[in-house]
Swiss-Prot record:
Disease field: Joubert syndrome 3: A disorder presenting with cerebellar ataxia, oculomotor apraxia, hypotonia, neonatal breathing abnormalities and psychomotor delay. Neuroradiologically, it is characterized by cerebellar vermian hypoplasia/aplasia, thickened and reoriented superior cerebellar peduncles, and an abnormally large interpeduncular fossa, giving the appearance of a molar tooth on transaxial slices (molar tooth sign). Additional variable features include retinal dystrophy and renal disease.
Protein's recorded name: Jouberin
Matches recorded under PROSITE patterns: SH3 (PS50002), WD_REPEATS_2 (PS50082), WD_REPEATS_REGION (PS50294)
Effect recorded for residue 443 to D: In JBTS3; alters interaction with HAP1 and NPHP1; loss of NPHP1AHI1(2):NPHP1(2) tetramers; loss of localization at cilium basal body and cell-cell junctions; loss of positive modulation of classical Wnt signaling; decreased interaction with CTNNB1
Induction: Down-regulated during early differentiation of normal hematopoietic cells. Up-regulated in leukemic cells at all stages of differentiation from patients with chronic myeloid leukemia.
Protein task: Involved in vesicle trafficking and required for ciliogenesis, formation of primary non-motile cilium, and recruitment of RAB8A to the basal body of primary cilium. Component of the tectonic-like complex, a complex localized at the transition zone of primary cilia and acting as a barrier that prevents diffusion of transmembrane proteins between the cilia and plasma membranes. Involved in neuronal differentiation. As a positive modulator of classical Wnt signaling, may play a crucial role in ciliary signaling during cerebellum embryonic development.
Free-text tissue specificity from the UniProt record: Highly expressed in the most primitive normal hematopoietic cells. Expressed in brain, particularly in neurons that give rise to the crossing axons of the corticospinal tract and superior cerebellar peduncles. Expressed in kidney (renal collecting duct cells) (at protein level).
Length: 1196
């Protein structure tokens, strides 16, 4: 900056020397011209000069090129007019012009409209015009107001020249007319030269501005830099010379006796704008240029460019960030919003760069000192009775005490980059610390990075004993709140250089140690920096008391011991949003009441970009924890129940989370992952960090809390080891107590009984080990060492088959075993007898199933995206969720502990979490509709036969994952209309099927069948009331049809003959032999058909192993001999065999179908072959024509 200033001064001096030389030459020429003009009695006409001067005023612009181009033309015209003007023809106009020019020059030299000058002018008209600039008083420097403008205008209107006065002046000036004309011409030339000088000065300013902009482009726009020296010089010189604005300069035009326009009063204070740092620097350089020009020439009025923004009356501007700034010359510049008395000092400690490697640094912290630069002591309080650093500060503490942050533990947080991210609050008036007056303290903030010493270090190391207060000093930094340029270093993130603390012992001085380092000791750079932010904080009106006060305004308030225990035992109080609403949630399912199958979609929850692998409700039912997967990681997402509100994410795992479980008191969450760790998370407000990490050598597939003691955690790993951990909730470590290596393969699942006396572990080879796990609360480690094996379960049925999931039955006597052979088993642990549940496909994925809390139903997911429901007591499949929007296998199912609610999840691209709930009102409305439409659709050609096709209501398609309110959105009339339309569509299909049957078939069954069919009707008939009572909900779309008697026969299922032997590889396949006649119920695809053989066996069989009877008759004799068909007697015997009472088709080929029980009248029994065959045919045709929709299907 100094170089640019010196160059400007040199150029200005050179220019003025040239101008003065030119001016002296012109004066010589003018003197010669005077003599010629006197001799020839010719007067110089100044009209041309006036017109040129007026033209320059009108065309004055910021473009110096225009001025430069006009200057030669003006000079030429001026010289020509001066030499050729004739004063004899312009005597009258010249006299008027002289008077007006005198008035104009006086007004120009006194822009404030001083009345005394006007009075002197009128009182002494014979004297010459005063050329010197009058001395301005302090009143002239005051800003201009509208009232002053009005007064000045009023004065100017009264001081216009009168005709009588002009006549007297002209008479007195007749004698020396020639001399006065020359003097006036000289004045005009001086005014013209003044304008030329101003234009050249503007051109110089423009060049300086351009250079300064290029040099200052790297400064940020929101930072203000001011030079104290330049501003002080500018203030001094502004008091001497008034600055005029270009826009406020009056314009004069002389023609005849009129003056166009009026002179305006101009403010003596220059406008100051805070738009940017560049404008401030450029304006200061322009002022310095003016000052240098004033040093070389006499002070004359000069024009400067007006700032783009107007100055407010209170001298306040708004910068680009919307911050009000005080622009008074006597006060420092900082945002006005920080001057509020309600604000207090807030220091936010962000972090440091990586500290220097030192094994002695394990938990650094930052100590903040508020020191006065004048005294070296802590800053005195503005109010001695106001607590600033601590709530219990006494009045005798009249200074601001230092405050420290919390320590950052490298070991616990697994990082050597300290990130405190902590807000430190000093309850001191913020404007008091920012005052720049001599009486106010000049505040410096000192930051010390410390590490506390252990007791052993202090005892063993004598050098450490010399350390003050048992702290090891690592580095320090400082920050001045008000810089040397008067700007406040606040409201932005600052990076402070750290320095080594001096090694020499401290001298006993009465100043703060950090201040002594700053003022007297050399500063050796520490290879790191500290990031801080200082700002004014508004203190909240109400601060809740706490066990330990964290700031000066927070009260410490303790609670009784029993209140603390009650608080620890309830996890509801620790959840956000639940403390405000203290009402108890009333669940729909009463204690001891049997569970219902949920029949209404409640809402869908977001599970991340890759879906959810496992989920679980908390024991109190208020939180749903879901182990999800996203692009950035594998978070555990917590949702509030029943609202479905998102609570928070627990991030830390680096790979898929296989298992998730809650502690018995719901204070902790345990997860196991394939990243080789099991993690414990605290269920607390705003706590998203890992509480404990249990490291393992490989993948961890399962982890559980011990039901009796939450400090014991059991994990199952890929290395076939079971590990027991003791987790101290109040200490920083987890201790590995014991390891078991009984299993020969990796462990997939663990579970405990309710009391925690037994544990069950299952591995990949189908082996289940029962453990005795009784513990004593007072001696955990000793109890764990006494854990033994109770027995090993090695069933031949699932030997070598991986066990996916284990769960104890609510009665504690049975065990749910989910294996990867598409079979679920519930085993009685006393006699080791298991009941099978077939239908849910599971051959590849790790899928979890679940039992309801009452043990009434068993829910299991499948790889085909269907959820199956069984009755564990009977083994019957009672329902299925057949059209869920999942494209991936359903991984986990969780049933709510207190509500008839279930949650499903799948692991795949954008798979949601679905929650279903039981709605009694929906079930009641559907029951009424079922009764109303029972048996009211007569069909032509078919006689009384009731075909009950029972389906659950169509569930709405959830395209988006928005939470639906649990309310009734449809009225009963609207539902009735929808059901009627649905029933009409179905009955049309049945009519077409019946017409086809009546047209093509005719057969008469023997009379003996009538008695059998009547018994079958009584056994298979299941009324709507029984269905509703058993399953707790009803179905829409119920079809009840009465058929009239006819002489036509109902078509039997087509039959095929087996050409080759086939042995079933799966439980849902059919074993056939050559020559077997198979009834085909439906063709699943071109490769697999579904049917039954004469022994009552049903299942899938390959289509390429069979042929129709017609094709079989055309086969060569050698093939017929190898696979002879059944004899007519055997065939008749098979046809007359009683149909089974229960019809159940379990399908896992990605389709769902419905079975109905059919009942016939006695007249119909004589004309139809078999109830079983007719039921399968009708069911198959109905399935082909059903409408797409999401259903829960009940199977009788």
């Amino acid at each position: 900056m100094p170089t640019a200033e010196s160059e400007a001064k040199v150029k200005t001096k050179v220019r003025f020397e040239e101008l003065l030389k030119t001016h002296s030459d012109l004066m010589r020429e003018k003197k010669k011209l005077k003599k010629k003009l006197v001799r020839s009695e010719e007067n110089i006409s100044p009209d041309t000069i006036r017109s040129n001067l007026h033209y320059m005023k009108e065309t004055t612009s910021d473009d110096p090129d225009t001025i430069r181009s006009n200057l030669p033309h003006i000079k030429e015209t001026t010289s020509d007019d001066v030499s050729a003007a004739n004063t004899n023809n312009l005597k009258k106009s010249t006299r008027v012009t002289k008077n007006k020019l005198r008035n104009t020059q006086l007004a120009t030299e006194n822009p404030n409209g001083d009345a005394s000058v006007e009075e002197d002018k009128q009182g002494k008209p014979n004297k010459k015009v005063i050329k010197t600039v009058p001395q301005l008083t302090t009143q002239d420097l005051k800003p201009e107001t509208p009232e002053n403008k009005v007064d000045s205008t009023h004065q100017k209107t009264h001081t216009k020249p009168q005709p009588g006065v002009d006549h007297q002046k002209s008479e007195k000036a007749n004698e020396g007319r020639e001399e006065t004309d020359l003097e006036e011409d000289e004045e005009l030339m001086q005014a013209y030269q003044c304008h030329v000088t101003e234009e050249m000065a503007k051109e110089i300013k423009r060049k300086i501005r351009k250079k300064l902009k290029e040099q200052l482009t790297y400064f940020p726009s929101d930072t203000l830099f001011h030079d104290d020296k330049l501003s002080s010089e500018k203030r001094k010189k502004k008091k001497e010379v008034p600055v005029f604005s270009k826009a406020e300069t009056s314009t004069l035009t002389i023609s005849g006796d009129t003056v166009e326009g009026e002179q305006k009063k101009e403010s003596s204070v220059r406008s100051v704008s805070s738009d940017s740092h560049q404008d401030d620097e450029i304006s200061s350089m322009e002022q310095s240029t003016e000052d240098s020009m004033q040093d070389d020439t006499k002070p004359k009025p000069k024009k400067t460019k007006k700032k783009t923004k107007a100055v407010a009356d209170n001298n306040e501007d708004v910068d680009g960030d919307g911050v009000h700034e005080i622009t008074s010359r006597d006060s420092p510049v900082y945002p006005k919003c920080l001057l509020d008395d309600d604000l207090v000092l807030g220091v936010y400690i962000h972090r440091t760069d990586r500290l220097k490697s030192d094994f002695m640094i394990s938990h650094p912290m930052v100590k903040i000192h508020v020191v006065d630069e004048h005294t070296g002591q802590y800053v005195k309080k503005d109010d001695s009775g106001r607590p600033v650093s601590s709530y219990y500060e006494k009045e005798n503490v009249d200074y601001i005490l230092p405050i420290m942050t919390q320590p950052y533990d490298f070991k616990q947080l697994k990082s050597r980059l300290p990130e405190w991210e902590e807000q430190i609050v000093f309850n001191e008036n913020f404007p008091y610390l920012l005052r720049g007056s001599d009486e106010s303290p000049k505040v410096i903030l000192f930051f010390e990075i410390l590490d506390f010493l252990s007791v052993d270090e202090i005892k063993n190391n004598s050098e450490v004993q010399n350390q003050e207060c048992g702290f090891r000093k690592i580095a320090w930094a400082f920050l001045k709140l008000l810089g040397a340029n008067g700007n406040a270093n606040i409201n932005s993130k600052l990076r402070l250089q750290l320095y080594y603390p001096p090694t020499k012992p401290r001298s006993p001085l009465s100043v703060v140690e950090a201040f002594e380092w700053w003022s007297k000791c050399p500063r050796n750079h520490y290879p790191s920096t500290l990031y801080v932010t200082v700002r004014g904080l508004k203190v909240p009106d109400c601060i809740k008391p706490s066990y330990r006060s964290m700031m000066a305004l927070q009260e410490e308030k303790g609670k009784p011991v029993h209140c603390e225990r009650h608080h620890e035992s309830s996890s509801v109080d620790t959840e956000p949003g639940l403390e405000e609403s203290k009402e108890v949630i009333k669940w729909k399912r009463l204690p001891g009441q049997a569970c219902r199958i949920p029949n209404k979609h409640l809402f869908s929850l977001n599970a991340g970009e890759r879906g959810c692998f496992c989920l679980d409700f908390s024991h109190n039912g208020r939180i749903l924890a879901a182990a999800c997967a996203s692009r950035d990681g594998y978070p555990i997402i917590l949702y509030e129940i029943p609202s479905g509100r998102f609570m928070r994410e627990l991030c830390g795992h680096l790979n898929i989370i296989y298992d998730l479980s809650w502690s018995k008191d719901d204070h902790y969450i345990l997860t196991s992952s394939s990243d080789g760790t099991a993690r414990i998370w605290k269920n607390e407000i705003n706590n998203t960090n890992t509480f404990r990490v249990l490291p393992h050598p490989s993948f961890v597939y399962t982890a559980k809390f011990h039901p009796a003691v939450r400090e014991l955690v059991v994990t199952g790993c890929y290395d076939s080891m079971i590990r027991i951990w003791k987790v101290e909730m109040r200490e920083d470590s987890a201790i590995l107590v014991r390891q078991f290596d009984v299993h020969k393969s990796f462990i997939n699942s663990l579970c405990f009984d309710t009391e925690g006396h037994h544990m069950y572990s299952g591995d990949c080879t189908g082996v289940i080990v029962v453990w005795n796990t009784y513990v004593k609360i007072n001696d955990l480690e000793h109890s764990v060492h006494h854990w033994t094996i109770n027995k090993e379960i090695k069933e031949t049925e699932f030997k070598g088959i991986p066990i996916s999931y284990l769960e104890i039955h609510p009665n504690g006597k049975r065990l749910l075993i989910h294996t990867k052979d598409s079979t679920l088993r519930i085993m009685d642990l006393r006699i080791l007898v298991a009941r099978k549940f077939v239908g849910a496909a599971n051959y590849r994925e790790k899928i979890h199933s679940t039992l309801t809390p009452c043990g009434t139903f068993l829910f299991a997911g499948s790889e085909d995206g269907i959820v199956y429901v069984w009755n564990p007591e009977t083994g019957e499949q009672v329902a299925m969720y057949s059209d869920l929007p999942f494209k991936s296998p359903i991984r986990d199912i969780s049933y709510h502990p207190f509500e008839n609610m279930v949650a499903f999840c799948a692991f795949g691209q954008n798979e949601p979490i679905l929650l279903y709930i039981y709605d009694f009102h929906v079930a009641q409305q559907e029951a009424e509709m079922f009764k109303r439409y029972n048996g009211t659709f007569p069909l032509p050609g078919i006689h009384q036969s009731q075909d009950a096709l029972c389906t659950c209501p169509k569930l709405p398609h959830q395209g988006s994952f928005q939470i639906d309110e649990f309310v009734h959105t449809e009225s009963s009339s609207t539902k009735m209309q929808l059901v009627k339309q649905r029933l009409e569509t179905v009955t049309e299909v049945i009519r077409s099927c019946a017409a086809k049957v009546n047209k093509n078939l005719s057969f008469t069954s023997p009379p003996a069948v009538s008695s059998q069919q009547s018994k079958l009707k009584q056994s298979n008939m299941l009324t709507a009331q029984e269905i509703l009572h058993q399953f707790g909900f009803t179905q829409t779309g119920i079809i009840s049809i009465e058929r009239k008697p006819c002489n036509h026969q109902v078509d039997t299922a087509p039959t095929v003959v087996a050409l080759y032997d086939y042995t079933a590889n799966r439980s849902d396949e059919l074993t056939i032999h050559r020559g077997d006649i198979i009834r085909v119920f439906f063709k699943d695809n071109e490769d697999w058909w579904y049917g039954s053989i004469g022994k009552g066996q049903e299942g899938y069989f390959p289509a390429n192993h069979v042929a129709s009877e017609t094709l079989y008759q055309e086969l060569p004799p050698e093939i017929k001999e190898r696979s002879p068909p059944l004899s007519p007697e055997e065939k008749t015997k098979i046809e007359k065999s009683p149909a089974p009472q229960k019809q159940s088709i379990n399908k896992n080929k990605s389709q769902d179908f419905r079975l109905g029980s059919e009942s016939m009248t006695h007249s119909e029994m004589r004309k139809e072959q078999s109830h079983e065959d007719q039921g399968h045919i009708m069911d198959t045709r109905m399935r082909k024509n059903k409408q797409a929709g999401r259903k829960v299907t009940l199977i009788e």
